[in-house]
Each structure stands twice: as C-alpha cells, then as structure tokens.
C-alpha cells in the first residue's frame, strides 16, 4: 500500500516520506510521534503478503534481526501490521548508501577501505554464526555504508530475510535441493542445492565474492543466464586479480581469496573472522603509495550486471536438472504473522549480551556514528 505523508502506524510512527521500493515492498522514513527519533519502516506489499513463503521470509527477518545484537547489524526496534493487514518492520534509520551504489559510482573500492568493510562485515556475521544463523544473501545491496566523523566507514549488514537457522529443526521453509540467494554470490553448496551443507563457510564464500567485486569492479562469476552462473560457481575457478592490477592488489590477497574459493568447505578458513584477518594481513603487503589509489575498473569481456542486473532468486532444482520458479511451500495462518512467544519491541525487556565469537572484541567495542 502507498502510505500518505502524515500517516501514523501503530499509534507510534508518523510517515515522513517514501525512501524507495524494494523486492519485498516499500520503505519509508518515519519519526516516532513522541521522541521524533527518525526510523525506517519496511512495509511488505499486499501482493507479497498473500504468499506464504514471502510472508515467512518477512517474519524470519523480524525474528532473526531482533535477536542479533551487534553494532554492525541493523537494529530492529519494532514491528506490526497496517490496518489493512500488511506487515511492517521498524528499523534504525541509516543515513548513507549501500555498497552497490558505491560500486556503481566509483567502479572499485580502494584496498584499505575494502579491508575496513570486510573486517566489519565479518565481525557482524561472526556473531550471527555464533548464534547458528547463516545470512545466505550477502551482497553489495545488503551492506550499508555510514560515514563517521573521522571520515572512516562504518558498516551495517542488513536483510536477514532468507537466513538459515542451523540449530532449528528442518521445516517446509528449507526443502531438499532448494537454491536460495543471489546467484553471483552463492557458494558451490548453495548453487548445487545442497541445503544440508550450507553453513558459516557459505557466508565466507560470499564475502570473498564481495571482496573481489570491491577490488576489481566486477564479479568473479558471471554469465548472462542464471544456470550459467550456477554452473560456473560449481565447476570453475576465477582468474587471479594480482597480474591485472599489478601494484594495487598484492599476490597475497589472491592467495587468501583462492583459499576461500575452494569448492570444498573444509579447505576454507575455519571462521569468517579468520578470513578477514588473513585478508587484512595480505593487504598490508601492498605498496603503501599505490594501495589506496583509486581508478577506473578495467572493462571485462562480456557484459556484467549493474545495479538492476543483480537479482535474487528463489527456485527449486528438480532431480533431473535445474528449473527456476518461485517456491511457496510454507503454510502460515495470517491471523498473527509473528510468533506468540516473541514479544513486540515496545514490550520487550532489555536483552542480555549476545553470544559472540571470542575473536570479535575489537568491533564489539565500536559503536556507530551519532546521527
């Protein structure tokens, strides 16, 4: 639904302006009617709210994001439903841009800034992994960049809508041979539909793709069709970056990425923070004068997608081959779309400190910039 300016949702949030339209619905800037604190409201479209799978994704995003406490993960402050039944999610307001917009504008990200981004994304996801949650859709559009007072980058990881909770019992949300995510950023186990093999190392693969994309301005796996991308992810290796970007990307970075791009999960780093530390150490071997030098990305052979060319797909692979198509396999009663035992944010008691990976102390002490 389109919300007119001035509409008040849940007696608490006054709509200020529309921000944009996403895959799940519309996003608005709003303000709390009492405190006037700015928030962002993500409202699901009426059409998608009628589909059980889409509704389940939205519900999962609410539950997972609210339970994960980390300064580099977007904060959910409330949720509810409109008078006509569309669910909405109230989040902290982020003033900045996503990494996808940054890459579209600048082509590439200088190595030192890429290191900042990788460390913070890894820090955020390490907390999710410690709680048994795998993001499964890490990509530039889900990495938001805030500028701090000292000019550094502060990262927020967003959209846990298709995350996988490893400790949960198997449900109809996760079917055997199901492929979920964005093809260009999928790990081989995701691309092959091996759902039982998807774990924290799958997110590590996606972060390596993100790293490659930032450094080169292009994707390591790209074909003009979905099946072509998936087959490439499963069977092919990307070309090393160092020879093409001599002086900008050291060979040690290639070595780190090559390890993460192993088709075997056990050959990757044991944790996503271990990958980030190895990447930072490898980046430190770059020549200081040229490591931060920006420049246009070389144009790859063949067309690669821009902002509108990256798509997220949710499709099932048939036993005899790949077949794309939306899955709506979850039965949910629409009377109450959030769990009965899951309190609303305005009634919740302060949560205890989240369990975090032991090597995450540096970024847990960091806090986002004042806005």
Task: Locate each region found by the language model.
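Hydrophobic/aromatic scaffold residues of ePK-like serine/threonine protein kinase catalytic domains
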Residues: 67, 117-118
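Conserved short submotifs of the Hanks-type protein kinase catalytic core
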Residues: 84-98, 102
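Conserved N-lobe loop of protein kinases adjacent to the ATP-binding glycine-rich P-loop
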Residues: 31-38
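Protein kinase glycine-rich loop
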Residues: 16-22, 27
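C-terminal lobe helix-coil module of Hanks-type protein kinase domains
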Residues: 119, 125-126, 182-288
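AlphaC helix of the eukaryotic protein kinase fold
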Residues: 45-67
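Activation segment of protein kinases
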Residues: 49-53, 146-196, 224
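Activation-segment/catalytic-loop signature of the eukaryotic protein kinase fold
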Residues: 79
């Amino acid at each position: 639904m389109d919300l007119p300016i001035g509409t008040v949702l849940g007696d608490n949030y006054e709509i200020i302006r529309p921000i944009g339209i996403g895959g799940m619905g519309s996003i608005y800037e709003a303000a709390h009617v009492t405190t006037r604190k700015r928030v962002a409201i993500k409202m699901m479209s009426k059409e998608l709210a009628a589909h059980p799978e889409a509704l389940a994704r939205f519900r999962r995003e609410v539950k997972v994001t609210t339970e994960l406490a980390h300064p580099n993960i977007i904060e959910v402050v409330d949720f509810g439903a409109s008078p006509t039944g569309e669910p909405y999610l109230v989040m902290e307001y982020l003033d900045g841009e996503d990494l996808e917009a940054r890459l579209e504008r600048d082509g590439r990200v200088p190595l030192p800034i890429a290191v900042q981004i990788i460390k913070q994304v890894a820090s955020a996801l390490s907390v999710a992994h410690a709680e048994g949650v795998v993001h499964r859709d890490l990509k530039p559009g889900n990495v938001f960049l805030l500028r701090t007072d000292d000019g550094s980058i502060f990262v927020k990881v967003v959209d846990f809508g298709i995350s996988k909770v490893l400790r949960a019992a198997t449900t109809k949300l996760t079917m055997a041979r199901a492929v979920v995510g964005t093809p260009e950023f999928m790990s081989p186990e995701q691309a092959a539909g091996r759902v039982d093999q998807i774990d924290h190392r799958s997110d590590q693969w996606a972060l390596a793709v993100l790293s490659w994309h930032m450094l080169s301005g292009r994707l390591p796996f790209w074909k003009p069709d979905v099946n072509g991308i998936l087959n490439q992810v499963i069977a092919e290796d990307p070309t090393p970056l160092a020879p093409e970007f001599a002086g900008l990307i050291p060979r040690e970075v290639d070595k780190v990425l090559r390890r993460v791009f192993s088709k075997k999960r056990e050959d990757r780093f044991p944790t996503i923070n271990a990958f980030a530390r190895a990447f930072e150490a490898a980046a430190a071997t770059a020549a200081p004068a040229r490591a931060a030098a920006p420049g246009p990305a070389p144009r790859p052979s063949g067309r690669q997608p821009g902002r509108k060319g990256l798509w997220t797909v949710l499709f099932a692979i048939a036993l005899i081959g790949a077949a794309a198509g939306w899955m709506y396999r979850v039965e949910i009663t629409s009377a109450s779309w959030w769990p009965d035992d899951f309190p609303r944010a305005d009634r919740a008691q302060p949560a205890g400190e989240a369990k975090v990976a032991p090597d995450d102390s540096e970024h847990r002490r960091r806090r986002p910039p004042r806005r």
